[in-house]
Amino acid sequence: MQKSVRYNEGHALFLSVIARKEGTKRGYLSKKTTENSKWHEKFFALYQNVLFYFDTDQSARPSGIYLLEGCTCERVPALKVSTVGKDALDKLQYFLVVFGHDGQKPLELRTEEESDCDEWVEAIQQASYSDIIIEREVLMQKYIHLVQIVETEKVAANQLRTQLEDQDTEIERLKAEIIALNKTKERMRPYHVFQEEEDPDIKKIKKVQSFMRGWLCRRKWKIIVQDYICSPHAESMRKRNQIVFNMVEAETEYVHQLSILVNCFLRPLRMAASSKKPPISHDDVSSIFLNSETIMFLHEIFHQGLKARIANWPTLVLADLFDILLPMLNIYQEFVRNHQYSLQVLANCKQNRDFDKLLKQYESNAACEGRMLETFLTYPMFQIPRYIITLHELLAHTPHEHVERKSLEFAKSKLEELSRVMHDEVSDTENIRKNLAIERMIVEGCDILLDTSQTFVRQGSLIQLPSVERGKLSKVRLGSLSLKKEGERQCFLFTKHFLICTRSSGGKLHLLKQGGVLSLIECTLIEEPDANDEDAKNSGQVFGHLDFKIVVEPSDAPAFTVVLLAPSRQEKAAWTSDISQCIDNIRCNGLMTSVFEENSKVTVPHMIKSDARLHKDDVDICFSKTLNSCKVPQIRYASVERLLERLTDLRFLSIDFLNTFLHTYRIFTTATVVMEKLADIYKKPFTSIPVRSLELFFATNQNNRSGDHVNDKSPRLCRKFSSPPPLSISSRTSSPVRTRKLSLNSPIGSKVGILDLSTTSSSAASSPTSANPTISPPPSNNNNNSKPPLDLSRGQSPSSPEQSPGALDDNAEVPRIDALCGKLRRSIRRAVLESVSLDKFIPESPQASEPGEISPCRSPSTPRHLRYRQSGVQTAENSRCSVSPASAFAIATAAAGHSSPPVFNNSERTCDKEFIIRRAATNRVLNVLRHWVSKHSQDFEMNGELKMGVICLLEEVLRDPDLLPQERKATANILSALSQDDQDDAQLKIEDILQMAECPKAECFESLSAMEIAEQITLLDHIVFRSIPYEEFLGQGWMKTDKTERTPYIMKTSQHFNDMSNLVASQIMSHTDVGSRAGSIEKWVAVADICRCLNNYNGVLEITSALNRSAIYRLKKTWAKVCKQTKALMDKLQKTVSSEGRFKNLRETLKNCNPPCVPYLGMYLTDLAFIEEGTPNFTEEGLVNFSKMRMISHIIREIRQFQQTPYRIEHQPKVTQYLLDKTLIMDEDTLYDLSLKIEPRLPA
């Protein structure tokens, strides 16, 4: 019996699966069976030369397999059928697959579509392996033929190349033969040709003509070149080239800084993060150094491109370089967005002592040059604005038809978009970087500065006076040298703490062992000596009322007093106003957070959190992520109206916002507008404050608010002091001065959300300053035994509104109420006088004080014994109480007086609200005016109209019959400060010294000592420097065409610098012999070194710049006589004041020195120009760029710190007459001509 054919069924099934999924042709066909000649529809799949068919397209196994190798496929006509089914069958298309041997029945298939039939026939016909083999053979033959042709062509090409080389050799040989033949022909010419000589006169004439032609050509070319050199185009190109050269130097420095960041910090910290006990995690390293390494690689490429362009000088094409840089700006954008988070992570990591120790080790690397990590992290933030300034300067010197102009303008526009974001981020992180820089300067470290919410306010030098028992001052004199030396302290004020440090000789800071870190919430500020204290009276006479006290009452240690002495009355006023404002802010925040906060433990007070205008961007304001000292988002952009609204928002006053506003308001508004706003707030507080702010100020939760709405048109809402005060207010007072005593009762059941002062059950202790107040429990109501929960956030009890307030069960609720009342009493007593007094200048007379009051010489804003303790927070949380912040203000305001508690009915509560708002508005106006007058007195000295407006407003305030005693005293203090004489009258002015200098001089340089000259240079430099009003630093006026009118004092400072430098150069060049000049140089270097010791770095730069002038620097014989020690000292001085790296050495030196000090003004002008040109003052929508204002304010604050600390140097007219004698000064050309006479140029 014949066996069946075996085949690999598994592989066949595998191929069927591939055919069903990836076959060449797939689809349903009708197949005619061989048994009964019926047609059955099957799913066919063609794969290579095998045809599979399945029952359906979902079948896993094929029903049959056909091998198509050697078969043919052709179409056949339709079958003959009866007439009935003819129409249907005519539409079907038939084709046959005929196999290659006889006896095999063909495969009959049909489809419904003709196109489908043609595709199947064509696919089956092409499914033949033999056909493919034949085609391959044909292609191989063609390929071999082409290869032979190519080889033949290569041989022919080599032959032609050889022929060309041979022909070149032949040409060279023929040329050499021609040259040789020509020489031979010359030698073979007849001798008589050379005997025909020209006439000697003709030869002379030709020679003269040749000389004349050469001279004329050279003269013409010289004129052409000279004209071009003097042309504007050449001058522009010279400046353009200089800009490019400076750009290359700056880029070199920047790449070096990035390499230090990566090699000295990033890579070592990555390795440290991989150790067994890592001081930092890899995630923190990535967060701190995001994209730093990529930025370094990018700028290394950019730097190499710049150097390649310089190699092609004078052809400088830079646009394509910036085209390379622009697509990489997204890397910078990620770095910018991460910058603030980076510094916050770094501050958190520094709390780990292991990391801090490791970081100090890295920062001590010589390559870092004493700079900190956060300094290197900030460098990339300044690079894009630096490119913008460079492009701006390049475009200024690039002709409009230049090929690069459009590319440079495009690059500048793209960079400006990123620069705007960068400036905002730098402004937002300025506070973190400042805190970290101060923390690094303190040898012992200071953990409180690692709190990123801590805001820097002020720093400066104060003298700490010694104290003895009972807190009385010992008998010391202000002029005592030992007192100034031993008692000098470097003080730093932050929003939460006050640091007192001593500075070592190396510039590092050391915190005092006792009282080095003062928590402001535990401090009480006393600005004037107690009028009843004889010792304090004497000290006021001794110290000229420049001293003030800070009484510290820590919770875990005995109380002590710190007595500080300011260098001037203006400095004292600035310090005390800032300290007082910080204490007010932190106690207000503590009051609202600990007592009136909801149980959700939210750090931001509820009223602020509920006001979307304080944190949500709008068309007229945009906020940053950074919070200010009042836990409110900082303003990034805002309209003038929104800025004035923030200034007069009665809920809070951020000290950093106030300082920035007062420094920069001239840029976007005028003093008159600010004054009008303050006057409106005082006279019409309800109409001038946004309605939403008023609602959130009271934060009531009444069911029917319509009864409490204030009528804006009500005449009693405007202050009219010509008529008696409103009856609703005056009826509750027994005197023109409103006196009310605080009364406490449980607000349970009250209809009004604020703490109702009209219902009382017990009064406060007789003295607001009593240490242990007692309070009786609230009365019980026998008619109502219900126990509603103590939820003051709703302002309404579950019981009916008609219930008596304080309806409680004695047995169950009294302890809970006692705890609440005790906590309220502590916080309220702390708030007494906080929100109503601002007196800072002069003590009140003793008759104005009642026996129970705090001493009027103490700052009422910071009363003694009224302080907030942390335990109060826990009590507040446990008692689950929440009252609107307006309650706190109501209590604090009501507690200012001492009369018996009045009782009000419900109809009088609206008037009570009016009284609260009026008191808050008065306080805000007085507070702003006090800061304005004490810190910016120049505004009122230069603007008589503004001064009269303030005086009129304050006099109007004094006529208010409802004015509280503390408000009256604060008003009088401000008026006194405005009306007093100029505080600097006792100090010398440059005009007085110039008048003295007009007298005949009696001294010469040789008769004056180096110490005398250095001291008087320092005195003159500081007098000129301190005379610059702060408004001249705004608007870049010193770079305008009318700079003399806009910034006269800055121009005087610049002129004084140039005159002093010219005097030094002229004095040296006035000597005729080498030894005298060398001795003069050595003496001037000694003067410069003494100036350095006196912190007069402006004087150091005046002298070193004079010595580096070309007229002096080229005198090699003179410098050869100068001793090596003097040269080494001069190199040290030059390094200190070098402009390299944006004066990085000078900045570090200024950071480590105590005022008085005279910095180089040009450094700050460069910073201000950098900020001004980097970003505009207003956005495209017309909003004020307040982030830019904040950066400008930081620079002005640093300048004013040095301006306001005077030198105690005695004026010596004989020395200043010599220094200011302009007859001794030579101009630059005269100096250089004299230098050439002294040492002529060596012959080339």
From Swiss-Prot:
Protein's membrane topology? Peripheral membrane protein
Query: Is Calcium one of the keywords?
Result: yes
Chain ranges of the PH domain:
22-129, 466-584
Domain IQ per the UniProt entry, residue ranges: 201-230
Major site of localization recorded for this protein = cytoplasm
Annotated segments matching region Disordered: 704-743, 759-814, 843-879
- Which residue range or ranges hold the Ras-GEF domain? 1009-1241
* UniProt KW Metal-binding keyword: no
Give GO terms for biological process. Answer: Ras protein signal transduction
List the biased-composition ranges (Polar residues): 728-743
Residue ranges annotated as compositionally biased, kind Basic and acidic residues, are: 706-715
Residue ranges occupied by any DH domain in the UniProt entry: 239-425
Q: Which residues form a coiled coil?
A: 147-189
Read off the InterPro entries from this record: DBL_dom_sf, DH_dom, PH-like_dom_sf, PH_domain, Ras-like_GEF, Ras-like_Gua-exchang_fac_N, Ras_G-nucl-exch_fac_CS, Ras_GEF_dom_sf
| Residue ranges occupied by any N-terminal Ras-GEF domain in the UniProt entry | 631-745
* Low complexity bias: start-end ranges: 759-774, 781-806
Keyword terms: Calcium, Calmodulin-binding, Cell membrane, Coiled coil, Cytoplasm, Endoplasmic reticulum, Guanine-nucleotide releasing factor, Membrane, Repeat
Q: Name one GO molecular function term.
A: guanyl-nucleotide exchange factor activity
What does the UniProt entry say about where the protein is found? Cytoplasm; Cell membrane; Endoplasmic reticulum membrane
Q: Which GO terms describe its cellular component?
A: endoplasmic reticulum membrane; plasma membrane
SMART domains for the chain: PH, RasGEF, RasGEFN, RhoGEF
**SUPFAM superfamilies the record matches:** DBL homology domain (DH-domain), PH domain-like, Ras GEF
The cross-references to Gene3D superfamilies, in alphabetical order and at most eight, read: Dbl homology (DH) domain (1.20.900.10), Pleckstrin-homology domain (PH domain)/Phosphotyrosine-binding domain (PTB) (2.30.29.30), Ras guanine-nucleotide exchange factors catalytic domain (1.10.840.10), Son of sevenless (SoS) protein Chain: S domain 1 (1.20.870.10)
Query: Domain notes, please?
Result: The Ras-GEF domain and the N-terminal Ras-GEF domain mediate Ras activation. The IQ domain is dispensable for the Ras-GEF activity.
Protein name per its UniProtKB record: Ras-specific guanine nucleotide-releasing factor 2
The record lists the organism as Danio rerio
> What high-level taxonomic lineage is stated for the organism?
Eukaryota, Metazoa, Chordata, Craniata, Vertebrata
Per the record, the gene is: rasgrf2
